[in-house]
A protein has these predicted regions:
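Active-site-proximal, Lys/Arg-enriched surface segment
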Residues: 45-46, 51-133
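A short, flexible helix-boundary coil/loop motif
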Residues: 20-22, 29-30, 34-35, 218-242, ...
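Short helix-capping/linker segments at secondary-structure and domain boundaries
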Residues: 6-14, 124-129, 330-342
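Electropositive, glycine- and tryptophan-enriched low-complexity nucleic-acid-binding patches
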Residues: 110-169
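Short, conserved catalytic/metal-binding motifs centered on acidic residues
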Residues: 1, 15-16, 49-54, 90-101, ...
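Domain-level cores of phosphate- or acyl-group-handling catalytic modules
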Residues: 144-205
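Gly/serine-rich nucleotide phosphate-binding loop at the start of the catalytic core
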Residues: 1-47
Length: 384
């Protein structure tokens, strides 16, 4: 299942098309450390079809598979490989957002059931994002049901996140759906920090209060610059303190940006302390880092992983397929930013798509031998 996503065929049929070609069956056996029983299975080596994988996935508890990405990220944390990704060298940033998993089959009453998933991803160094947890939700009307379903899923996800990482200092990166009392209460109860996009229509009174008090504090201003896709982006950061959000009081940060092609205003509400020394990091290393989870969804949707593709109709198997997709994404991050990055440093324009093509060709054509050297260490920077 993991190879289905690592090789980015986008569907089960694409994987089945090559599964018994060339050196692929023997290489998969070597990689999985599985000996081929010729007496029982014959001399021709094969890889099981995806339908058998679906049958197996439909029998395995989703909660058990969900522990795999958590265990992988926990291992990376214990190895201290991700320490440089913390905000202010303290807060582990976790981006939370929902997306369409796939459009399920029509129900008996003729309505389409949409499978949505809420994902929590750890923001790492060097632009990496590691999917950590997923909460699944079904809805018939994405426009009408999305808010209630996603906020309820957030409550369940927050409970799991707290149980698995009770002592980690966490800062949640949230979109404009989340600046509401239940989310504020959860962060206060668990001692979490948060940076959430603030939309004018979501909290109109708080937004107006923030604008008015910001205009009365001209000294709370910082001029900065960041690197943009089209050239340098000039930033004007302004902020205000103690803005009431119902029973809570938070800080609001405004970021006006002018790039060579556009002008944009970003607004965030946060319970982090804002000062002249800290606002640049809060805006650029915190608030804007939430885009990493949208980039993750974009790669999984359009980069061959198959997010939004219906891999199977069985709900349990479909959820397990999605979780293994997250496992494959973590593995790809480690490969692409680790050993493959060092091996291909001379090829600056080598894309992930080309790397996947080379990996697929190697598995089909080059035998994996048992005497291949093992990896000595894992690192993301050649100078480390």
């Amino acid at each position: 299942m993991a190879l289905t996503f690592l090789l980015r065929g986008g569907s089960r049929n694409a994987f089945d098309g090559d599964r018994n070609t060339g050196q692929f069956p023997a290489n998969v056996g070597h990689l999985c450390e599985q000996l081929w029983d010729e007496a029982r299975l014959g001399t021709r080596r094969t890889v099981t079809c995806s339908q058998n994988a679906v049958q197996h996935a439909s029998r395995v508890a989703v909660s058990a598979v969900a522990e795999i990405p958590v265990a992988m990220v926990r291992r990376l944390l214990h190895m201290r490989l991700l320490d440089s990704g913390r905000l202010f060298d303290q807060w582990w940033m976790i981006a939370v957002d929902g997306t369409l998993q796939d459009r399920g089959h029509d129900t008996q009453d003729g309505e389409a059931r949409h499978r949505y998933v809420l994902t929590a991803s750890l923001v790492g160094p060097h632009g990496m994002t590691f999917p950590l947890m997923s909460e699944f939700m079904d809805m018939h009307d994405p426009v009408r049901d999305k808010e209630d379903c996603e906020l309820n899923a957030f409550r369940r996800l927050a409970t799991r996140l707290r149980a698995d990482f009770p002592r980690r200092p966490i800062c949640l990166l949230l979109d404009g759906l989340y600046p509401v009392k239940p989310v504020f209460d959860t962060c206060e109860t668990y001692g979490w920090k948060f940076i959430a996009t603030l939309r004018e229509g979501r909290q109109p009174s708080a937004y107006d209060e923030a604008v008015q008090t910001m205009m009365l504090s001209p000294s709370l201003r910082f001029l900065g610059q960041r690197k943009g896709e089209d050239g340098p982006v000039e930033q004007t950061l302004r902020w205000t303190h103690d803005v009431p959000f119902g029973a809570h009081v938070f800080n609001v940060l405004f970021s006006g940006e002018i790039s060579p092609t556009s002008a944009t205003l970003w607004v965030w509400v946060t319970n982090l302390r804002l000062t002249h020394e800290r606002v640049y990091a809060v805006a650029n290393h915190g608030g804007r880092a939430r885009n990493s989870i949208e980039n993750l969804f974009n790669v999984e949707k359009n980069g061959g992983f198959g997010l939004e593709h219906t891999f199977c109709a069985n709900t349990q198997a479909s959820q397990n397929y999605h979780l293994i997709m997250q496992v494959a994404f973590i593995l790809w991050q480690l490969l692409a930013k680790g050993v493959l990055h060092r091996l291909t440093q001379a090829c600056r324009k080598l894309t992930d798509v080309k790397l996947v093509e080379l990996l697929r060709t190697s598995l089909l054509s080059v035998p994996v031998t048992s005497d291949a050297p093992s990896f000595g260490q894992l690192r993301f920077c050649s100078s480390a």
